[in-house]
Amino acid sequence: MKIAFLTSEYPHPKANFAAGIGTSIMNLSIELVKQGHQVSVILYGQDNDETFSDNEISFYKIKNIKFKGLSRYLTQKKIQQLINNLVSDGKIEIIEAADWTGITSNIKLNCPIVIKLHGTDTYFCHLDNRPVKFINKLREKRALKRADGRLSVSSFVAEVTKKIFSLSNDFKVVPNGINLEKFTSDYSSLNTNQNYILYFGTLIRKKGLFELTSIFNEVYEVNKEVKLLLVGRDASDILTKNKSTWEIMKSQFDKEVLRNVEYIGSVSYQEINKYIQNATVCVFPSFAEALPVSWIEAMALRKAIIASNVGWAKEIIDDDVNGFLVHPKDHKTYANKILELLDNCKKRNDFGEKARKKVEEIFSIEIVAKQNVDYYKKVLERKK
């Protein structure tokens, strides 16, 4: 099958910034090639127009057109022309695009479009209790309604999306997956004496970073030796308009506690493994996700996790079986769960082993890729 992905992010040196969506597309693309499919990645919002190949994947970079009042529309038409040319050349049979801001809302293609829910702007505004821009909601709804197929990375994001957009369409749930060969634990790290808590991901309000400051203050009151390590890109804060979430966080830690906090900054996708391996526990106190790849990566490396108990979380972690789920606002309980795992090596290892097993059974990219292909085939059959 000849499959394309339309995205603004992908973790490649020649591409602009990439986060969770880009990582999930990369994992899927590489596995699809392994399974004998041809894959193209169309990257819009880039610094130049360029075509190149890597790992048997064809990349097409698109520089957005800038023209006051018409930039988005003209960029969409540029994307449309490129994809339709590739379809005419026999290089694409079906294309998958992410839901964010409805990039396909004004794109007419000569092949089926599948929209995958990773979380629209409307979805995240809903979870954050923030107003959404009317035009974004309109575009996202239009893109979803016009799609030939609809996938979702979790049941939760599908249900919420249907409700907020008043959609009657069904969504096929296929989770994000990871390459388990790249997440193989060094067993010597499971009994680590590093004694540190790891958060990795973007430093941003919606991921519960301002709750994490209070939680770690509580942890430090009991355990003065433990350290908190933060790895990820620093983002601006939408409510305070501050350009740095990290700067706000520093002011929220107790003074003596801050000495035990280290912010590493953003690291490459290849580097993150070593930080996860050496962590005693991983924490994810998020308020807004779709199905976070970071949680699955930590589970694959047999790490004990304390995560948010909101919505999507139960589709990844079974509370008190392969991790702990606690509401991020419940600082005391969250801190106590961290302390429990710091003090109980046996429980950490038990959680870690069961977490790995769940990833192998549900989130292996080999399984996930086959589920995607099965769905693409059904969409193509319907379009005949």
Task: List the predicted regions and their residue ranges.
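Aromatic "clamp/platform" in nucleotide-sugar-dependent glycosyltransferases that forms part
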Residues: 287
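Membrane-proximal helix-turn-helix segments that form the acceptor-binding/catalytic region
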Residues: 133-150
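Carbohydrate-associated surface elements
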Residues: 156, 177
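Conserved acidic donor-binding segment of nucleotide-sugar-dependent glycosyltransferases
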Residues: 319-320, 324-331, 340-346
